[in-house]
Curated annotation (Swiss-Prot):
Gene3D superfamilies: DnaJ domain (1.10.287.110). The keyword Cytoplasm applies. One of its GO terms (molecular function) is unfolded protein binding. This is DnaJ homolog subfamily B member 6-B. Homooligomer. Keywords: Chaperone, Cytoplasm, Nucleus. It comes from Xenopus laevis. Has a stimulatory effect on the ATPase activity of HSP70 in a dose-dependent and time-dependent manner and hence acts as a co-chaperone of HSP70. Plays an indispensable role in the organization of KRT8/KRT18 filaments. Acts as an endogenous molecular chaperone for neuronal proteins including huntingtin. Suppresses aggregation and toxicity of polyglutamine-containing, aggregation-prone proteins. Also reduces cellular toxicity and caspase-3 activity. One of its GO terms (cellular component) is nucleus. The gene is dnajb6-b.
């Protein structure tokens, strides 16, 4: 039988933060899209890691698991307990590991920033992400889990700040594409600012398009490797100064 603490490589007295860090590391390591040559094992490990995180990240489920084992979560009351000792008498159904992954990362593609950073969450705490259906056309585009999200709409994240959304996908030979959007409401009516950003990495170059709409004015900036290449305000292209970076 799978032992959830062993799956995540943590101790029984590990803190919730330790559980989150362990899941983050192992989910990124065993994501099936990252292991095309070892997909069968990756899918099994990815599922086990998601199950372990679902249980150990929830204090009530973790307490039941510690007392009764996995049978307790199914309402069976293992480990010497009785069925009626278990609060979850109707059983607990595990979600899809993809859903757990999407929710944990708030809909944002964890591979769009430094995958090997000590704590990639440092890059997007407080961000808000959309959840969507996983789509893997043509045998599976890399991390297309994050494709198909609307620019704005209902969203959910464990680290919800209530103003932004983001997602991304890898598209075959076209390079990685990521999108993010933010909307800020001011104190008065009409004082609204929205920002949407699209980033493409094509042939080793990062091309970022930022669209800012504020008080009826639209500003579109296009940067290549951090250097501003074009600026358009309300559909009219602006002359750039040579010292623009």
């Amino acid at each position: 039988m799978v032992e959830y603490y062993d799956v995540l490589g943590v101790q029984r007295n590990s803190s919730p933060d330790d559980i989150k860090k362990a899941y983050r590391r192992l989910a990124l390591k065993w994501h099936p899209d990252k292991n095309p040559d070892n997909k069968e094992e990756a899918e099994r490990r990815f599922k086990e890691v998601a199950e372990a995180y679902e249980v150990l990240s929830d204090s009530k489920k973790r307490d039941i698991y510690d007392k009764y084992g996995k049978e307790g979560l199914a309402g069976g009351g293992g480990g010497g307990g009785s069925h009626y000792d278990v609060p979850f008498q109707f059983g607990f159904t595990f979600r899809s590991p993809d859903d757990v992954f999407r929710e944990f990362f708030g809909g944002r593609d964890p591979f769009s920033f430094d995958l090997f950073a000590e704590d990639p969450f440092d890059d997007f705490f407080g961000r808000r992400g959309h959840r969507g259906n996983r789509s893997r056309p043509g045998g599976g585009s890399f991390l297309s889990t994050f494709g198909g999200f609307p620019a704005f709409g209902p969203s959910f994240s464990p680290f919800d700040s209530g103003f932004s959304s983001s997602f991304g996908s890898f598209g075959g030979h076209g390079g990685f594409t990521s999108f993010s959007s933010s909307s800020f409401g001011g104190s008065g009516m009409g004082n609204v600012r929205s920002v949407s950003t699209s980033t493409k990495i094509v042939n080793g170059r990062r091309v970022t398009t930022k669209r800012i709409v504020e008080n009826g004015q639209e500003r579109v900036e296009v940067e290549e490797d951090g250097q501003l290449k074009s600026l358009t305000i309300n559909g009219k292209e602006q002359l750039l100064r040579l010292d623009n970076k």
